[in-house]
């Protein structure tokens, strides 16, 4: 049985999205003295690794895309900062996050986990999706607080009624 994350990656690949795309950039700062385009340069500073190693799950054209099914608060922060870095560097026009709305009742309804042989274990499925797991409400509050900079972000929150055990 394929995990939702693996299935999602296959769909993205079929649509020609590149997976695990990283951005790195140096910054060139030029200081000029005087007015106008002909003002002489008085100093030049290069800041290496100004943007260093931010990653998005998927990228194609002007869109960065992240899939966060069992996200923690800090994961959203990382994703929004990556979107911001890609956007400010002129690489993307929009970031998209697909996540789930809190649906812990659904996970509780699944009962116990199975081992690799299909035998029920003592651990519940819902234990993986505990109190530290967040949903769209935490993501929206982070976007409202400006964590994505000027990058527009489209959030798709999958509701509990749209999830089936199949």
Which residues make up each language-model segment?
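Glycine-rich active-site/cofactor-binding loop and its immediate structural neighborhood
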Residues: 64-67
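Active-site metal-binding core of divalent-cation-utilizing nuclease and nuclease-like domains
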Residues: 1-61, 74-81, 88
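C-terminal functional extensions of proteins
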Residues: 140-166
């Amino acid at each position: 049985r394929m995990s939702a994350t693996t299935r999602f990656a296959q769909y993205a690949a079929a649509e020609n999205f590149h997976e695990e795309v990283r951005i790195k950039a140096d910054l060139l700062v030029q200081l000029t003295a005087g007015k106008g385009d002909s003002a002489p340069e008085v100093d030049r500073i290069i800041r290496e690794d100004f943007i260093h190693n931010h990653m998005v799950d998927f990228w194609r054209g002007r869109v960065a895309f992240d899939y966060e099914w069992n996200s923690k608060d800090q994961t959203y922060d990382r994703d929004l900062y990556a979107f911001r870095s890609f956007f400010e560097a002129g690489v993307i026009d929009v970031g998209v996050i697909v996540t789930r709305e809190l649906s812990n009742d659904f996970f509780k309804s699944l009962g116990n986990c199975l081992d690799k042989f299909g035998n029920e274990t003592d651990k519940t499925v819902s234990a993986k999706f505990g109190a530290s797991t967040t949903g769209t409400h935490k993501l929206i509050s982070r976007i409202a607080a400006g964590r994505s900079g000027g990058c527009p972000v489209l959030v798709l929150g999958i509701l509990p009624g749209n999830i089936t055990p199949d």
